[in-house]
Amino acid sequence: MGSFKTSKYYGFMILFFMVLFFYAIFKFLTPSNFGSLDNIFSYFQSSIIYSVGGCGLYFIVVMGLFDFAVGANIVFSSIVGVILSEKFGYLGFVLGCVGCGTLIGIAIGFLYNSLKVPSMIVTVGLMLVLESLAVFVAGGVKQTLAPELRFFSGAPGNIILAGLAFVFMWFILTYTKIGTYCNAIGSNEFVASNMGINVKKYKLIGFALLHFFVGIMAILTVSYGTTMTALTGMSTMSRNFQPLMGTFFGVAFRKYGTPISAIIIGEFIIAIIFNGFVALGAPTTVQNIVTGAALLVIVTLTAREKRGSVVK
């Protein structure tokens, strides 16, 4: 029985129970406009956008790091991708989003290692910089993705792209040292360093991988919404939190060996909750309350004090 409670099957059982629990609550409260098969498929399609970002955040969150420039990079990379798509079509769109996102991730990792200040401070500063750059690049004009370039706006394009991202993460965690070393650094950075792990190198890799996935998320985001507007004043901050909640599901369920599945299903659970409140006619501010409350609960359940921890 003890081994079953640490198995992936037990983890899946908990996740599916949570899905059924929240679905049943909202289906009971508002049966007429919630939870049809079409609705569920729509919830899933919106949730996989955040799941991709959640997969990227996993690489740094397990090391105890945070990145508040994710939302700003989504906006900036989306704008760059849309502008390049006007001249180079799908190639410019995909490479613009993913390439721009990855380069920004490398820059963030380099600055974090060089400045030696907490990741929150570095990324908040870069968030402000990226927001301003996005306004400059966009020229103050809303960027619209051409209709002929919207393959990733819905099924099957969005599912294929997100699926490739999930497979890529599975490959990294299963067949490379990156996942193991990131976990080791998060458990005890000093011990990991004494074991010969190049801590700075893998933190840089973590940020690069995060923003590679952010680039993919940018493709899905601007395809789904078809437009992107550059805003300043920390307006992109709200884009950070929903993928982060999926990441915390992954961190909480990694003990069952199911981090990727937990991120995907966790984001689906969040989508059910959000859309359930919409079906009830609750004001949009309720979503912010739910987001904040969910973050507090998940962080409380997953955060643990570690001996030998350092300022992140």
Task: Locate predicted features.
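Cytosolic-side transmembrane-helix boundaries in multi-pass membrane proteins
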Residues: M1-A24, V167-M169, S187-K201, F277-K312
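Alpha-helical transmembrane segments of multi-pass integral membrane proteins
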Residues: F12-L15, I25-F26, F152-I185, N198, ...
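Loop-to-transmembrane alpha-helix initiation sites
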Residues: S46, S119-M120, F152-A162, K203, ...
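Transmembrane alpha-helical segments in multi-pass inner-membrane proteins
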Residues: T229-I289
